[in-house]
Amino acid sequence: MLKGLLSVLLVMVALSSALGKPEKTTPKKEKEKRVPQTLSRGWGDQLIWAQTYEEALFWSRSKNKPLMVIFHLEDCPHSQALKKAFAEDKEIQKLADEDFVILNLVYETTDKHLSPDGQYVPRIIFVDPSMTVRADITGRYSNRMYAYEPADMKLLLSNMQRALKFLKTEL
């Protein structure tokens, strides 16, 4: 009787283990590769980005480098176009990496000096290490003074160099 019970138990264990195996499925390939979300938000993944405005001001002051603040929205087509042009421009990426503290924000800060002509996106504002907002460094539009478009990369590069020159003559 005991042998019969053991054989039934053994058969049941074998059946349950055979039936309990998961089906072999091939992993489905994702149609679109998702890029991990970093502080760069696509503006330059190899760059070191500050996380908050306060942290950026601290880095700017301690490293004696100007701060470049980029205001944008993830779902804004103008912001997306500027982001693509900014990320693909090797000169801008190199200058930003070597000589600037950089921060990109998808929200407004409490510092009203960062929106001298209104809150719109995309806009780029420069702040020197003495924490002075550089309102004199503007884009090419009179109604949105700090706005840049993908075609304005040469102007942005020129303004970045201007922010560095003023920094050296002011300090």
From Swiss-Prot:
Record's subcellular location: Secreted; Endoplasmic reticulum
Motif Homodimer stabilization: where in chain:
40-49, 55-62
A GO term for molecular function? identical protein binding
Expression across tissues is:
Expressed in most developing organs which contain mucus-secreting cells, including the epidermis, olfactory bulbs, otic vesicles, pharynx, esophagus, pneumatic duct, swim bladder, and intestine. Expressed in the gill, pharynx/esophagus, swim bladder/pneumatic duct, and intestine in the adult.
**Which residue positions does the secretion signal occupy?**
1-20
Q: Which Gene3D superfamilies match?
A: Glutaredoxin
One Pfam family assigned to this protein is Thioredoxin_7
Keyword Iron-sulfur assigned to the entry: answer is no
**Which UniProt keywords are given for this protein, alphabetically ordered?**
Endoplasmic reticulum, Secreted, Signal
**Its quaternary structure?**
Monomer and homodimer.
Family according to the record:
Belongs to the AGR family.
- Protein name as catalogued: Anterior gradient protein 2 homolog
Which species? Danio rerio
What's the name of its gene? agr2
